[in-house]
Amino acid sequence: MTTASIIIGILFILCLTSSVVSRSVGLVNSDDKPSQKIWIPVTFGLSQGVMALLGSGLGRLIAHLFTYIAEYMVFAMMLVVAVKLFVDSMRVLKGKMMYTVSKESDMFLLTILAAFNTFLYSIVSVFYAPFGKWFFVAVTVAGFLWALFTVRVEFAPGIIKKVSFVEFSASVFMVVIAILYLFTDLI
């Protein structure tokens, strides 16, 4: 692996898991227990890893159908994730994607929703997964870190714009990475 492919791989995984940001902002208050402050990021991280494994398992079942067009499938799935991130960023800007959770079952559904991009891309991870078998660990760690850095952030008008910018930037970087994947040999 070259330095460029490592940097692109890290950026790709951060973009893929960036949907955690809009779903985890403001989930922990300053008066919550320390165990609550770490439990939520762990849940987000594990859901990213589990959904990546499920998507990869599904991808392995149907990979034989796409062997001749594998690079185009990877490109298309990167674009699908980029479009979903862009739509999510616009919904965040309108205030429609900020959540509060009162029950643990709601938290479970929220973490699954945050990991849906990872599931979608993992279907084609058979053909391209940055860092090979370490892809699943990297996705889990990235989901955990995104949640760890954002769960204690409180709601404010400026925060909504910043969260929207994170997801918008992730969608732009995902498109750039998709183009690099299809048209260059950097990845």
Predicted regions and their residues:
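Helix-coil boundary and interhelical linker segments in multi-pass alpha-helical membrane proteins
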Residues: 1-7, 57-69, 125-135, 182-187
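Juxtamembrane transmembrane-helix termini in multi-pass membrane transport proteins
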Residues: 3-59, 126-127
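Generic transmembrane alpha-helix signature in multi-pass membrane proteins
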Residues: 8-13, 21-31, 106-114, 118-130, ...
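C-terminal ends of transmembrane helices
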Residues: 22-36, 85-96, 147-162
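Hydrophobic alpha-helical transmembrane segments in multi-pass integral membrane proteins
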Residues: 50-57, 113-126, 174-187
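Selective transmembrane alpha-helices of multi-pass membrane proteins
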Residues: 64-93, 161-187
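Alpha-helical multi-pass membrane helix bundles of inner-membrane/thylakoid proteins
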Residues: 85-114
